[in-house]
């Protein structure tokens, strides 16, 4: 599986284009906005966009979902249903943060822990990782040892838990009990900032290391 990271919105959120090399079929994970930038990658690589994946319902991750799904006629998978209130509240979030007008949406498929999603011939595991938001999910591709973790974990930091229904203890448990056991060699794409690995964060991250 190949990928390209496209930082979008004033929050520089890492939208990610993922594709199966065998089929050139692709998904966009967390298209928060700036859709022309994302679609330039799709066109440059000669990809067929087949779905949208969403880690959680915050506007910088999901603000462009409704427009992209409508433009391409493609389904939306994720997050977990416990983030419905965040998605329903995106129009208000857009006013609060000064974003362009954003539409709410209903995913074609709410995801649960243990589900799988496909991109072309590739299969990603779904891991429910509450804490930053109650319905946050992580996508993990075992073959390439790659995880898309949204705002659960960052290089040297962790996701905020001071939002409605955030839970610090749940976040720490998600990282230590659901992500780190996948293996030190797993590289991850966070919602913001540079990539890292679970091994690096387990050793050096001051919030969850040691």
Locations of regions flagged by a protein language model:
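Short Gly/Pro-enriched turn/cap motifs at secondary-structure boundaries
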Residues: 6-8, 100, 107-108, 128-130
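Short, glycine/acidic-enriched loop or turn micro-motifs at the edges of active sites
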Residues: 23, 33, 59, 83, ...
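Active-site HxH/HxHxD metal-binding segment of metal-dependent hydrolases
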Residues: 33-118, 203-207
């Amino acid at each position: 599986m190949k990928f390209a990271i496209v930082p979008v919105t004033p929050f520089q959120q890492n939208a990610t284009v993922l594709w199966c090399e065998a089929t050139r079929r692709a998904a966009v994970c967390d298209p928060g906005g700036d859709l022309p930038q994302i679609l330039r990658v799709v066109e440059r690589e000669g990809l067929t966009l087949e779905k949208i994946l969403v880690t959680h319902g915050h506007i910088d991750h999901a603000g462009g979902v409704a427009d992209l799904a409508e433009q391409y006629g493609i389904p939306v998978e994720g997050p977990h249903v416990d983030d419905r209130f965040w998605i329903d509240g995106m129009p208000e979030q857009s006013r609060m943060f000064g974003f362009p007008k954003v539409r709410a949406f209903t995913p074609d498929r709410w995801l649960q822990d243990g589900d799988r999603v496909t991109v072309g011939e590739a299969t990603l595991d779904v891991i429910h990782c509450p804490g930053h938001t109650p319905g946050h999910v992580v996508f993990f591709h075992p073959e390439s040892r790659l995880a898309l973790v949204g705002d659960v974990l960052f290089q040297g930091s962790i996701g905020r838990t001071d939002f409605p229904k955030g839970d610090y203890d749940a976040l720490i448990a998600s990282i230590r009990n659901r992500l780190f056991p996948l293996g030190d060699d797993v590289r991850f794409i966070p919602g913001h900032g540079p990539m890292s690995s679970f091994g690096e964060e387990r050793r050096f991250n001051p919030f969850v290391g040691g």
